[in-house]
Amino acid sequence: MKPMPLCKQIVALMFLVIPAGAQSHVDPGIVQRIKVEAYDHSKVMEHLSYLSDVYGPRLTASPEFNQAAEWAVERLREYGLANVHLEPWGTFGRSWSARQWSVEMVEPRYAPLNATPLAWCGAAENPITGELIVTPYKRIFDPRKAREALDAYRKEWAGKLRGKFVMLGEPKVPDEQTKPQFTRYTDAELADLAKAPEHMAKNYGNFEELKWPEEIEDFFKFLSSLPESTVDDWWHALQKVNIARGQFLRDEGVLGVLVWDPRAHDGTTNAEAAGSPKSADPVPPPTFVVTAEQYNRLARVIERKVPVRVRVSLKLEVSATDVEANNIIGEIPGTAKKDELVMIGGHFDSWHAGTGATDNGAGSAVMIEVMRILKALSLPMDRTVRIALWSGEEQGLLGSEAYVKKHFGDPHSMRLTPEHAQLSGYFNLDNGSGKIRGVYLQENDAMRPFFESWLAPFRDEGATTITIRNTGGTDHLSFDAVGLPGFQFIQDPLDYGTVTHHSSMDTYDHAIPSDLMEASAVIATVVYQAANNPDMLPRKELPPARPAASSSTQ
């Protein structure tokens, strides 16, 4: 190669190392202090035990959530944070907490059933016994076809369900488990993840005219091609169908409902919601997910014309009216640029089948630990570092969306607040308890050199992958929606997607201590660097205003 003149070498080197905005130097001594504090003096598993063992699960606005939130506030104050408080974000819905439940087959034989109630269903305060019947009802993702299926179900079963327990859905043998349930990313998988994804044209147009794929893999690929406003429309439309179904079953005098879920097998149940938390919406009958093996047994006995009777009990603590929900906020004040912010967070709420350890007690425990580390080391930081632990994430990013709208801007109008200019970036953790392997740039390629520098001290621990890709389903999207830098870290899968996600196995024992220690060290380093970076972090162009969910889907 022909030698380059010295002046050109210098200019070329400048372009290689200087991103859009000056970048702070990574001090190996500071990183080493962070690692020692994170690995040798860790409290992350203690935090997780309180959040999951003592207070879990943490359904939004439930007594358990509120007790856990008070614990987090006290712990952050103990660590010396400032401005620690519960910040209300609005009216959520009814507080709902299951106090006791049982589901049993009592005829033709006795058998206790492995079942979990779905949130915001109705109670059976005294045990109820009745006949169980199968009423086939297919799970459909196309909202129009889902409405048609509900209409057909009404016509077929109206007047036939009173005083009965119903099995809502046809039995199906669970798929064979041919792949490992616990995995870590391989080098090849990370290399593939680092590549830019295949570009897909966005499907704009009339929501009602979209053609939705029926196969689940094709459906989720199609869903990723939709703008966020259309995804919101889809979600609201399906919720309307579910609420209407619950109303029909209640009006028909159904005693209770058993449902089949493809994830519920091998002794594990998965549970989300049967209805809406809003007090204005109808309350469906007591509704339970039953493991596939037991669900299928019940259906086979009924198919053989042998009557089946079940006994159900469900004691609930439910508020009579809609209640307010809170986020948990705390700060380490900055110095030279104290009016500017770096934020970290993760959702604090969980579903209720397990104890919410990996979703997302782990992320919350890590973020509390990050603040402890930064405060314990008395690291000087120019910008204020703020932690936010969100509620309402599992019901649609409600807590973070409300916070962003209040403090930074409204994605539906793109009217921005003065604080919008003061937030440098937001870093989120919510993909289970796996160690950090890198970060999603969320199409903000100007951030690549920053993360390359900040993650370099953790290359030997596997944090090597920086991908231009987006990732969804969690609270960084609320910031991204108004043009703020928001990032979610790449984490090893472990058994998050196969076993623990929203399941009865989402417990402390499925968290890996060394992985959470590593995550704490990585994020503490990233936050320290971002807080002391000479300039604000680079941003993407502001997005256009996002249409509100259409009136037909509200």
Which role does the model predict for each range below?
Residues M1-V11:
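Bacterial N-terminal signal peptides that target proteins for export
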Residues V17-P19:
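N-terminal signal peptide c-region/cleavage motif recognized by signal peptidases
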Residues S24-G29, S49, D53-F220:
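Noncatalytic luminal/extracellular "stalk/propeptide" segments of secretory-pathway proteins
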Residues V26-S62, A271-A273, D349, N428-G434, ...:
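N-terminal capping segment at the start of a domain
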Residues D27-I30, E107-N114, A123-A152, A158, ...:
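Soluble metallo-hydrolase cores and metallopeptidase-like ectodomains found primarily
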Residues V31-Y39, D53-P63, A119, G130-E156, ...:
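Second-shell loop/turn segments in exported
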Residues P174, W234-A237, A244, F248, ...:
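Acidic/histidine-rich catalytic neighborhood of metal-dependent amide-processing enzymes
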Residues E217-D233, Q239, G246, R250-D251, ...:
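Active-site-adjacent substrate-binding region
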